């Protein structure tokens, strides 16, 4: 299925390649580079690129393109999901997935890729199994391997591979037994000039960090599970139990894993947590324009909005901007015409604002459209959809674990039209 994998940085350099069948020439990536040049942003590169003899399927994460080369038609989402699993595995192994880290651990990277695919077909993709096959790198292990000439490859067949629970290894023991769950929701929205919502949806995930002794069996129930739509589960979840009772029942993998991802698309369930007041005017023949925006909280259940960043691509006719922020710092690049305002935390008693004048090109016509304002923010201890965990129960083991639930909402593609 997958013949080769190329890792390409944002500068267009191939810094790692892996071949499972025959060696595919690097020249096949020329088609990818052509598509990259045509795309305005890295995220806009087509995920599937047909060539005369191959198909190129790619994902872009952590400023790296992971490009798979296949020769026969396969379901694209199957390959793309595998590429995401590769990235998640690297992140689990090395803490971060970046070009320097991959280069520093290139031997382990090749060993992991060799185990994840067998003759081009996915084989071992569970992190628990891979860590028994290929030991994660540590400073001590690296020093020992350098001196002895040994590798990170395990000397025993992983027990989970032969188990009815292949995602969990046997014989797990912890002094402190704990299970943490993070409910993270990302809101994508387009707000029109009047402040009305054009479109809004929520992409949510529940990430888990489970460190429990033995073979625990967990059940996780929600206060309002019916609002979840288009749910994707980790293989450990018993789907029939979810279908009948809307309860998550599972034997968890050991360590960090994504329990489920979900989608909330019903407009009445998506609360917009921020609003933007704006006044942007360009004069027909004058050399000055006015710019003023204010950001405030809305439907946040009393939670603080923090990490707020406002960006806007200004028209080409704007030469410079003389602005004064009530808080935070701002920059304007006269070359790219990009305005950026790092607001920070929003105080409801004193709303942050940015106001001033714009220097316009003399004689330039008035722009056809006002700029779009893009927001980034996060809200701790709030799931904007209203999702709440009711309780977490454990069966099969006699000890009492420590349990914790954390919520967070953050902005995805959040745009305000002016």
UniProtKB/Swiss-Prot annotation:
Principal localisation: Golgi
PANTHER family: AP COMPLEX SUBUNIT MU
Keyword Protein transport part of the UniProt annotation: yes
Keywords linked to the UniProt accession: Cytoplasmic vesicle, Golgi apparatus, Membrane, Protein transport, Transport
CDD domains reported in the protein's UniProt record: AP3_Mu_N (cd14837)
Protein's name in the database: AP-3 complex subunit mu-2
InterPro entries named among the record's database cross-references: Adaptor_comp_med_subunit, AP2_Mu_C_sf, AP_mu_sigma_su, Clathrin_mu, Clathrin_mu_CS, Longin-like_dom_sf, MHD
One example of a Gene Ontology biological process annotation: endocytosis
Similarity comment text for this entry: Belongs to the adaptor complexes medium subunit family.
Membrane topology of the entry: Peripheral membrane protein
Location relative to the cell: Golgi apparatus; Cytoplasmic vesicle membrane
Coiled coil: none
Organism: Rattus norvegicus
Function (record text): Component of the adaptor complexes which link clathrin to receptors in coated vesicles. Clathrin-associated protein complexes are believed to interact with the cytoplasmic tails of membrane proteins, leading to their selection and concentration. Ap47 is a subunit of the plasma membrane adaptor. In concert with the BLOC-1 complex, AP-3 is required to target cargos into vesicles assembled at cell bodies for delivery into neurites and nerve terminals.
Entry's Gene Ontology cellular component terms: axon cytoplasm; clathrin adaptor complex; cytoplasmic vesicle; cytoplasmic vesicle membrane; GABA-ergic synapse; glutamatergic synapse; Golgi apparatus; synaptic vesicle
Name of one Pfam family that matches: Adap_comp_sub
Subunit and interaction comment: Adaptor protein complex 3 (AP-3) is a heterotetramer composed of two large adaptins (delta-type subunit AP3D1 and beta-type subunit AP3B1 or AP3B2), a medium adaptin (mu-type subunit AP3M1 or AP3M2) and a small adaptin (sigma-type subunit APS1 or AP3S2). AP-3 associates with the BLOC-1 complex.
């Amino acid at each position: 299925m997958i013949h080769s994998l190329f890792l390409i940085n944002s500068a267009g350099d191939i810094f790692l390649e892996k071949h499972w069948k025959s060696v595919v020439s690097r020249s096949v990536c020329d088609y990818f580079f052509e598509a990259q040049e045509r795309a305005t942003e890295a995220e806009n590169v087509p995920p599937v690129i047909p060539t005369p003899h191959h198909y190129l399927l790619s994902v872009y994460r952590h400023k790296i393109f992971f490009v798979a080369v296949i020769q026969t038609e396969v379901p694209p989402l199957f390959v793309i999901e595998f590429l995401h699993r590769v990235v998640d595995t690297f992140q689990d192994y090395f803490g971060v997935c970046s070009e320097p880290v991959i280069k520093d651990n290139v031997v382990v990277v090749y060993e992991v890729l060799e185990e994840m695919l067998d003759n081009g077909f996915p084989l071992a993709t569970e992190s628990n199994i891979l860590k028994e096959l290929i030991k994660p790198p540590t400073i001590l292990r690296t020093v020992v391997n350098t001196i002895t000439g040994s590798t990170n490859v395990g000397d025993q067949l992983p027990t989970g591979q032969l188990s009815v629970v292949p995602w969990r290894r046997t014989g797990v023991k912890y002094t402190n037994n704990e299970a943490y769950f993070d409910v993270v929701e990302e809101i994508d929205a387009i707000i029109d000039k009047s402040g009305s919502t054009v479109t809004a949806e929520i992409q949510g995930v529940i990430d888990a960090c489970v460190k429990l002794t033995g073979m625990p069996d967990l059940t996780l129930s929600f206060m309002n599970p019916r609002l979840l739509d288009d749910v994707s589960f980790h293989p450990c979840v018993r789907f029939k139990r979810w279908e009948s009772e809307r309860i998550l029942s599972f034997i968890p993998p050991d360590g960090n894993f994504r329990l489920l991802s979900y989608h909330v698309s019903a407009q009445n369930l998506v609360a917009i947590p921020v609003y933007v007041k704006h006044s942007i005017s360009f004069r027909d023949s004058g050399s000055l324009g006015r710019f003023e925006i204010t950001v405030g909280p809305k439907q946040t259940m009393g939670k603080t909005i923090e990490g707020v960043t406002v960006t806007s691509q200004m028209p080409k006719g704007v030469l410079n901007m003389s602005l004064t922020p009530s808080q935070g710092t701002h920059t304007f690049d006269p070359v790219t015409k990009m305005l950026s305002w790092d607001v920070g935390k929003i105080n409801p008693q004193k709303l942050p604002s940015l106001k001033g004048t714009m220097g316009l090109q003399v004689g330039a016509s008035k722009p056809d459209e006002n700029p779009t304002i893009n927001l980034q923010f996060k809200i701790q201890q709030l799931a904007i959809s209203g999702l709440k965990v009711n309780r977490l129960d454990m069966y099969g083991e006699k000890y009492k674990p420590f349990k914790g639930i954390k919520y967070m909402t953050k902005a995805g593609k959040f745009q305000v039209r002016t």
